[in-house]
Amino acid sequence: MALFLDIHTPKYKDKREVIWDMAEAMNKELLALRDAGCRCIQIEEPTFHFMANTYGKDHEQVKFMIDAFNREVQGLDDVELWIHTCWGNPNMQRVMEDTSYANSIDIYLERCRGDVWTLEMKDRNQKDLELFAPFKNDLKKKIAIGAVSHRVLQADRPEDVAGEIRKALKFIPPERLVVSSDCGFGRQGCNREIAFYKASAIAQGCNIVRRELGLVTTYVPAADAVLQIDVVPGRDVQSTARIAS
């Protein structure tokens, strides 16, 4: 949706017309993905959180963009639809002063279609988690919190991720919680190796909390000592293989 706002053409007298036509065009592409077998689609930046903080959540422009977004994803009820929201990431820089979801939480939870809402949280010190308290027992969407930052190059530890998850569980039930990064690592600055360590920490951190909740853990190859290639001299790899988690 953010890209649609930047379209400039003399073919349309009203920016809303081009946005709506682009939403319909995108809908055809998304339905084609669905028909090809795709069962999980993420939509990047509907911009509701930016616009709600600028104009107010009930502004006519915001209402129109919600309608356009819902038109874009129409007919995808059999696909898990992710709605990605962060606060910008040019060269891994913070660019927004007001990064509160307070004006947009109702939009994302109640007014727009989708199954999973992703939020930038780690880099904002989990600000706004308390906003989910009134919805805790009736969340219609899964909530994907960022548990590692896409702007910090220091690799996170599994214990760090587990700590972020515990904070989120105070306001979001485990069956509705998804753990992710704040945003993608594919922009400028973060190399593949650091991104790998951060992603691995997410998986291992989830397992720490799963054990605490009595839930089944998942196998994480990155934590399997048997697969380790940079073995420290004198370390007994076989004795540590059991910690693969």
Please tell me what each predicted stretch does.
Residues 1-245:
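Domain-level signal for soluble alpha/beta catalytic cores
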